[in-house]
Amino acid sequence: MAGERPPLRGPGPGEAPGEGPGGAGGGPGRGRPSSYRALRSAVSSLARVDDFDCAEKIGAGFFSEVYKVRHRQSGQVMVLKMNKLPSNRSNTLREVQLMNRLRHPNILRFMGVCVHQGQLHALTEYMNGGTLEQLLSSPEPLSWPVRLHLALDIAQGLRYLHAKGVFHRDLTSKNCLVRREDRGFTAVVGDFGLAEKIPVYREGTRKEPLAVVGSPYWMAPEVLRGELYDEKADVFAFGIVLCELIARVPADPDYLPRTEDFGLDVPAFRTLVGNDCPLPFLLLAIHCCSMEPSTRAPFTEITQHLEQILEQQPEATPLAKPPLTKAPLTYNQGSVPRGGPSATLPRPDPRLSRSRSDLFLPPSPESPPSWGDNLTRVNPFSLREDLRGGKIKLLDTPCKPATPLPLVPPSPLTSTQLPLVTTPDILVQPETPVRRCRSLPSSPELPRRMETALPGPGPSPMGPTEERMDCEGSSPEPEPPGLAPQLPLAVATDNFISTCSSASQPWSPRSGPPLNNNPPAVVVNSPQGWAREPWNRAQHSLPRAAALERTEPSPPPSAPREPEEGLPCPGCCLGPFSFGFLSMCPRPTPAVARYRNLNCEAGSLLCHRGHHAKPPTPSLQLPGARS
């Protein structure tokens, strides 16, 4: 049909971006320029919200809501990741640009971009098995070969990602998705919103650590301490995921024992592992959780170890015989954390198709598992106020400009080079433009100061408040000399991380807003040199929109709706192609000012000090009546 839009789809496993099954789109024997192929691929990947139906909400995160949708023309089922924060569009664009360049069976497949009211929303493939965390918490029996295959899939995806010069920084069992097939399960790695270029450590360069970001339960100890870190932080997170696979317990320290220095408590963890667990699999998980980053093996070696362990596993048949040899381990066994396994585990019975952890129900939050001793275990994440028990997500703010991550392998380092940090090129970027101030021009200062005089330390238990706009450029009050700059977001702690609310304790008038299904707190980094604000102002101040979602009060029905700020195409979905002549995203006309400027009217109503005591002066007399 003439004028019919081509169906939305992503490139195949062997296709390059912009190429379809028939080549570049010009027929056999006709070559097309690369700009044409890039333009065709970009336009065919664009969609609108009206192009989909049968939306079903299947999840929600800190920044987005996930929907299962079906394309009306092609009938293809996909996942629409709707961005909730307008200020998070830079991170969304970075994730879209990175996923558009990744092609691997164990990396979540990118399908296209949905543009709606100036916002970008990613379209990915639908995984019918949910997340790995959901699979492990279900009563689904998982044999050891199945768990080894899942671990191998994740390791292969991360090996491919690291080979491209990028590391994940937020690898969790929540971000690993599972596909159910007739032959078994397949795991893929998703959620690349915090991915970063692998830093190259060289001598003689400035040491500047990367931002402290990620989910605390899976973050490496060096990241939580604010030290220099690299792609080996993903290896530690992978070790925590392996512990979840082996014991089928959540990563919460109430179930997965941890040490006070954020390491793995190996003796306590061994009490959760059955005798049928393959010993090399257990040792590999312990090795990945090593406290020293340099002793953790890269994913090229981890995938080899997992393949060797799988070769030693017998087939899932009742008459299978146990193997005579165990899988060789070439990694350094001295890198095991304190209290490593001192005794060899008994060889598992290969006739069992189900592991010992499958025979018990998933742990209940009301009854944490017993670890075989009478010692009181302490959650190390609850000892630091900035981590709030670990049930938050650490983010980097302000959002970086949308610059494509270079997909080039990192230069190999010799063993004699010292791990010195250089500032990645992706960090040297101009600041993003601040949003226009939408506050009332002549609003009095009293309501803004009243928040510091509230009786309670916590915010009011009302609904969501209006997000705080950046109005620093138009502030009439100069900064007093000799004082440290005040924090616009929250108070900087000793570890230069500040929190917005707690997610580990029930709500009270002094602990923050009420809890919901999603993790209610988002932690952002603050510069180390900022001082504390007086009067505990940070407990009542709102963070920027890039850190926490705030919704504005709904305007009256008669008021015109203010359109979202348009996003120019050279910096959004077509940014990687650098087309200066193309503009695909809608740019609505500027909105009319929401409030009247009352500066002229308010001037006559103000009573200035010193003038109210003057006696009234007589005015001119009116002429008298004449006969």
UniProtKB/Swiss-Prot annotation:
Compositional bias of kind Gly residues: 11-30
Catalytic residue positions: D170 (proton acceptor)
Protein name in the entry: Dual specificity testis-specific protein kinase 1
EC numbers: 2.7.12.1
Predominant cellular place of this UniProt entry's protein: cytoplasm
Swiss-Prot/TrEMBL catalytic activity: L-seryl-[protein] + ATP = O-phospho-L-seryl-[protein] + ADP + H(+); L-threonyl-[protein] + ATP = O-phospho-L-threonyl-[protein] + ADP + H(+); L-tyrosyl-[protein] + ATP = O-phospho-L-tyrosyl-[protein] + ADP + H(+)
Source organism superkingdom: Eukaryota
Function noted in UniProt: Dual specificity protein kinase activity catalyzing autophosphorylation and phosphorylation of exogenous substrates on both serine/threonine and tyrosine residues. Regulates the cellular cytoskeleton by enhancing actin stress fiber formation via phosphorylation of cofilin and by preventing microtubule breakdown via inhibition of TAOK1/MARKK kinase activity. Inhibits podocyte motility via regulation of actin cytoskeletal dynamics and phosphorylation of CFL1. Positively regulates integrin-mediated cell spreading, via phosphorylation of cofilin.
High-level lineage: Eukaryota, Metazoa, Chordata, Craniata, Vertebrata
Domain Protein kinase: 52-309
Name of encoding gene: Tesk1
Composition bias, Basic and acidic residues: 348-357
Gene Ontology CC terms, in alphabetical order: centrosome; cytoplasm; cytoplasmic vesicle; lamellipodium; perinuclear region of cytoplasm
Single GO term (MF): protein serine/threonine kinase inhibitor activity
Compositional bias ranges of the Low complexity kind: 316-330
Modified positions (Phosphoserine) in chain numbering: S215
